[in-house]
UniProtKB/Swiss-Prot annotation:
<dbReference type="InterPro" id="IPR002337">
    <property type="entry name" value="Hemoglobin_b"/>
</dbReference>
<keyword id="KW-0007">Acetylation</keyword>
<dbReference type="GO" id="GO:0072562">
    <property type="term" value="C:blood microparticle"/>
</dbReference>
<feature type="modified residue" description="N6-succinyllysine">
    <location>
        <position position="60"/>
    </location>
</feature>
<dbReference type="GO" id="GO:0043177">
    <property type="term" value="F:organic acid binding"/>
</dbReference>
<keyword id="KW-0488">Methylation</keyword>
<dbReference type="GO" id="GO:0031838">
    <property type="term" value="C:haptoglobin-hemoglobin complex"/>
</dbReference>
<feature type="modified residue" description="N-acetylvaline">
    <location>
        <position position="2"/>
    </location>
</feature>
<keyword id="KW-0813">Transport</keyword>
<dbReference type="InterPro" id="IPR009050">
    <property type="entry name" value="Globin-like_sf"/>
</dbReference>
<feature type="binding site" description="proximal binding residue">
    <location>
        <position position="93"/>
    </location>
    <ligand>
        <name>heme b</name>
    </ligand>
</feature>
<keyword id="KW-0597">Phosphoprotein</keyword>
<feature type="modified residue" description="N6-succinyllysine">
    <location>
        <position position="18"/>
    </location>
</feature>
<feature type="modified residue" description="Asymmetric dimethylarginine">
    <location>
        <position position="105"/>
    </location>
</feature>
<comment type="similarity">
    <text>Belongs to the globin family.</text>
</comment>
<keyword id="KW-0408">Iron</keyword>
<dbReference type="GO" id="GO:0042744">
    <property type="term" value="P:hydrogen peroxide catabolic process"/>
</dbReference>
Length: 147
């Protein structure tokens, strides 16, 4: 569960309604793979990830980024039950994929950077703080199976 004030919920949901999930998702996952290259080991089947241009232009990265952001959006609809919302994904990433749960936090931080880039002055410090809190809540929910 993530505790957002009424103002924070309004800020997050208001901005989320303007997010191009395909564009932002692809960029966020792409940046994760470029900035933290060790995360690429989970995406061997994605083809060429040899440099930033290849990663950012990779159709599979973009498609998976969209999928990731759609899941994040589901979390927004279920703020009071993030652990339940992400239980199956947590189990998959822990038991089958063996993803380091720290990667969830890194992706959340990258998502905040990408949102700031896309929304500029509308991504005020209070909006950033609310998204950072939400990203941490989602990362914690995804890491739940690991505990």
């Amino acid at each position: 569960m993530v505790h957002l004030t009424g103002e924070e919920k309004a800020a997050v949901t208001g901005l989320w309604g303007k997010v191009n999930v395909e564009e932002v998702g692809g960029e966020a996952l792409g940046r994760l793979l470029v900035v933290y290259p060790w995360t690429q080991r989970f995406f061997d089947s994605f083809g060429d990830l040899s440099n930033a241009g290849a990663v950012m232009g990779n159709a599979k990265v973009k498609a998976h980024g969209k999928k990731v952001l759609n899941s994040f959006g589901e979390g927004l609809k279920n703020l009071d039950n993030l652990k339940g919302t992400f239980a199956k994904l947590s189990e998959l990433h822990c038991d089958k994929l063996h993803v380091d749960p720290e990667n969830f936090r890194l992706l959340g931080n990258v998502l905040v950077v990408v949102l700031a880039r896309h929304f500029g002055k509308d991504f005020t410090p209070p909006v950033q703080a609310a998204f950072q809190k939400l990203a941490q809540g989602v990362a914690t929910a995804l890491a739940h199976k690991y505990h």
